From Swiss-Prot:
It comes from the Bacteria. It comes from Vibrio parahaemolyticus serotype O3:K6 (strain RIMD 2210633). Pfam families: DUF2057. Residues 1-21 form the signal peptide. This is UPF0319 protein VPA1584. Belongs to the UPF0319 family. Keywords: Signal. The keyword Signal applies.
Length: 223
């Protein structure tokens, strides 16, 4: 009886450790984690720490990040940014590290960072299997909403896409067999408004000179 109690406690502790095991990812200071599992990433470690840590649950995880190494040029400190990387991996109870290349200088980075040769390695230095892709957004890059972008990416089913439980799903809508009178009136009002808008277009078109009519036709043809 005295032996059973300690064994039971030890078993309970072991089971508890298994149930709450997680994945820790060490992140270098020049890597910015922009989203994790469809949400804004929460990293531990101080602002000036050489490495920070991202804690994730066991199983399939998705991390969105960018690598931006800094270089000294005279009195200036300049960075070169990689594209935004989407990485999906499946691990459990592991300590991982994002390994990124070290470039000799700014020119070396500018020539090679677009084809970023990075790895996710475990505690023994062995590379973990990763599905990866790039999260590309044309045009202005300032103020990007990465959580929204990765939501759209996952919905589109990209190479490193993940379906999260919190993702919004379309619910079926049952339409009434008989359209209520107020809906009929609203529809009639909308049709009337469309008709009025069309009449006004005709009116102003007839009033316009030849040059304005030509510009209007060109605009319509482009739509």
């Amino acid at each position: 009886m005295k032996l059973i109690k300690p064994l039971t406690c030890a078993l309970a502790l072991a089971m508890s450790g298994m149930a709450f095991a997680d994945v820790t990812v060490s992140v270098p200071d020049d890597v910015s984690v922009l989203a994790a599992n469809g949400e804004k990433a929460k990293l531990s470690g101080g602002f000036f720490a050489s490495e920070k840590a991202l804690t994730l649950p066991d199983g399939v995880n998705q991390v969105v990040f960018r690598y931006a190494p800094y270089f000294n040029q005279g009195n200036d400190r300049l960075s070169v940014e990689s594209d935004v990387i989407v990485a999906r991996f499946d691990t459990a109870n592991a300590e991982l590290t994002i390994e990124v290349p070290k470039y000799r200088n700014m020119r070396d980075a500018e020539e090679n960072i677009k084809d970023l040769d990075w790895k996710l390695v475990d505690g023994s230095g062995k590379a973990v299997a990763v599905d990866q892709d790039k999260l590309i957004k044309p045009g202005m890059q300032i103020g990007r909403d990465y959580v929204r972008e990765i939501e759209d990416y996952n919905r589109a089913g990209g190479t490193a896409a993940v379906a999260f439980a919190g993702a919004a799903t379309m619910q079926p809508v049952t339409l009434p067999a008989k359209i209520p009178e107020d809906m009929k009136q609203a529809r009639a009002t909308a049709v009337k408004a469309d008709s009025t808008a069309e009449e006004m277009l005709h009116f102003w078109y007839q009033k316009a000179d030849a040059e304005t009519k030509a510009r209007f036709k060109a605009y319509i043809n482009q739509q």
